[in-house]
A protein has these predicted regions:
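Short beta->alpha junction loops
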Residues: 1-7
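Active-site-proximal C-terminal subdomain of hydrolase catalytic domains
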Residues: 2, 79-145
Length: 145
């Protein structure tokens, strides 16, 4: 999906679950997200921000812990997740998310099952753009041959 809304992302996650369930443990799932992430100011939990979320309330986004839980709900061969987003509260282009500065701490106990997660940054780190290539630096090197 390109420029996915919250509804479209949730539908996509549901479709992935249906695929995993129907393959009876033989599915190999790959999930990729490039965009903004944002921490909740009170709980410090990380959220992915779809295009229809304004960035003022992280809870309007897709909670990472819920995403991981849904991706491992059914038995699969493996699940690989690639996230090119930062959760420091800053935005690559310093747009409306730039004023936030909430440090999150990874919660490793939320990840269960045969899932591996690759992220462009963690905690208070920023994910950098590669403007000349119109990608994030993480995505550019992920796609490079």
């Amino acid at each position: 999906m390109l420029d996915a809304t919250t509804g479209q992302m949730n539908q996509g996650i549901s479709k992935i679950n249906l695929i995993a369930k129907s393959t009876k443990g033989n599915a190999e799932l790959f999930v990729y997200f490039a965009g903004h992430g944002l921490p909740d100011e009170q709980t410090k939990e990380a959220y992915l921000m779809p295009v229809d979320v304004n960035g003022k309330n992280a809870k309007d986004g897709i909670k990472l812990a819920n995403l991981y839980s849904k991706l491992t709900e059914f038995q699969t061969k493996n699940v690989s997740v690639f996230i090119d987003a930062c959760f420091s509260g800053g935005a690559r282009n310093q747009s409306l998310l730039a004023a936030r500065g909430v440090k999150i701490q990874p919660k490793e106990d939320i990840i269960k099952g045969n899932i591996v997660i690759f992220t462009a940054s963690s905690g208070a780190q920023s994910s950098l753009p590669y403007k000349e290539k119109n990608h994030g630096l993480f995505t550019y090197y992920l796609l490079k041959k």
